[in-house]
Structures are given as C-alpha cells and as structure tokens.
Amino acid sequence: ILTYTMYHAAMEGNTKSVPVNSKDRIINFLPFSHVFERGWAYLGLSVGAELIVNTYPKEIQQSMRETHPTSMAAVPRFWEKVYVAVKERMENSSIVQRKLFYHALNVGRKRNIQYVARGKRVPLTLEMEYKFVNKTVLSLVRKQLGLEDPHIFPTAGAYVSPEVEEFVHSIGINMIVGYGLTESLATVSCDHIGQPYTVGSVGRPIEGIDIKISDEGEIMLKGPTITPGYFRRDTTNAEAFDKDGYFHTGDAGYMKDGELFLKERIKDLFKTSNGKYIAPQMVEAMLLVDKFIEQVSVIADQRKFVAALIVPEFSVLEEWAKENHIEFKNREELCQNKRVNEMMRERIETLQ
C-alpha cells in the first residue's frame, strides 16, 4: 500500500536532500512502474522541471546527446557501461591523449573525492588545476555523454562499485548514491547535496526516516514514507513489522557516522558446502566493470567453490576473436573456444 500521504512526505524529504529545480532537464528512461523512476519524475514535476521521456532504453545514450539533460535517475549498470566505454576509448587513444586523460582524472579524484566528498576546503592550487583540466579534458568526456551541465544524478537499485562511483565523481558528475524500497516509496537514504559523503555508503537518511539496525544486522525502518502494510495480507503484515512498528527490509547493513552502509541482501546470501557465506552482489559488481561481460550471476549455494554464469558482451568478444584470427560458426562455438575461455579466465583473475 502506497498512500498520497507517503508521496507528500517523500517529496518533502527528497526536496531537501536532492534539490532539483525548475531549470533542470530530467530524462527518464527507467520504467515508470519502477517506484524509483516514478518518484523522481514526481519530484521533478513538483518543482516545475522539464521532463524528457525516453521510450527506447537501449538508445538512452543517443537521447542524452540530443537532449543534454541535467539530471537522470539510473541504476548502477548504466554507469558501469559508461565507465567501461570511456576506459576503452582512452586505451585506444594516443599515448599523449591517454596521459592527459588519466592526469585529469587523478586531479578530479583528488579534488572531488579527497576534499569535496569529505567536506574539506579545496586548496587554491588544486582548485585552479581542476578548473583547467575540467575545461580542457573532463568537459569533453561529459560532452560525449551529452552531460555538458550535470546537476544531480541519483543512482540506486543495486550495489554500486566504489571504483565506478569514484570515476563518475572524478569526471565531474554528481552521482547521488541512495538506497530504497518500493515499501519505502523509494528513497530511504542518499548522499545529501552540500554534505560530506563516503564512497561505498548509500548516504544519510532523508528527513523523517528512522533507521534501526537489529541485533541480527538487518536494516529496520520507520517513518512517514514507509508503507502501512500489504493489502489484505494480515499474516505477511504481522511478519513485516516488529513490535515497535519498524519495517523489516530484508537487507543487512550498518550505520557509521550518520551514513548507511549496505552489506548484502539477507535472502540472497549463499552458503557454500564448507559453511562460508557469500554475498553475490559484490562479486557480480566487480566482474561487471569488464568490457567483455554483459551479465553475470554468481552461483555458490551448497558448492565447495564460488562459480559465475557469464553472458559475454558479444559485440566486443566477436571483434576480439576476429582480431586474433579465431574462426567460429556461431556464438555457442565462440564461447566454447579454448583461447576465448583462457582469455576470459585471465581477465577474471586480473579483476580479483
């Protein structure tokens, strides 16, 4: 059950944490059935922002270059693909271009992660150097994405790799990492504009949300944006809330210095045959930053080892096979090729 009172409270809380305004151009490409996208669209409408609806998710990057949005709700997989694409382009550039890019990236990381993220005053020399590399290098990277004037880019829905999060901030895009559920009307916590944040956290609670960590380490919620329950499901409702009225999220986490850190989805934990628990999301996120990997599912339940089912990025893999003179009749034959498997195994070893 999601009530209008919950929506009103969510709009008030989010407006203070991530203040979009009437000058923003918000592009929507996630399904509106997804409470994250719907809530972000409502927030934009509530302040008079311009909404740009992209009806073809696969063409989102082209749409961004055409419409130049200042804001967009996205899932981590979108930014993982951006990260991989930019790195690939840089690796194929000249030595001079590559050195310039990585120097600019390091300056951006130092300024935006080591100082701004921690709420520290940026030294004048670093600020001047950042303005120079931002204008000459980083702005060109953002232009390729259609993000010449980035404002707020909330990201949630899955585990965000710290490597990807640092990269996005380093090129000058304000990624707002958050955490939420349908039952909480999306946002529970997020990085707050103008406040310090920690890479790897999912931010601070929005106004009105009370977070409690149970003795078992589960994240428990109470507040005006939390569902009153499930429609006509008395048994489920009795299990969904504790005696103090806190909602069971099913996610494990902890609080540190006012920020929430996720550990894993409790129900998604695997237990190997030797008794070790494995959190698949972190392993999957680590693998997904590789350009050869499109999708991955970690498998470990009741096995002595951790395995992964990988769907390759076939356009990249097929190009690599041609460059390495590997003949194949179809994708199945390509995946079974010994040299392909050796190459993938080496890349996975490097990622670990």
Predicted regions and their residues:
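Hydrophobic alpha-helical segments in the ANL/AMP-binding
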Residues: V35-A49, V164-E166, S170-I171, T187-D191
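Conserved ATP-binding/catalytic segment of the ANL
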Residues: P205-T272, V289
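C-terminal boundary motif of the adenylate-forming
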Residues: A252, D290-S315
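Active-site loops of AMP-binding adenylate-forming
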Residues: Y159-V160, H169-N174, L181-G200, R233-T236, ...
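Conserved A3 ("GATE") glycine/threonine-rich loop of ANL adenylate-forming enzymes
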Residues: R77, A156-V164, V177-H192, I206-G208, ...
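Conserved AMP-binding/adenylation subdomain of ANL enzymes
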Residues: M6-R25, F32-S139, D149
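Adenylate-forming
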Residues: Y4-H8, N14, V82-V86, F153, I226, E259-L288, L317-K338, ...
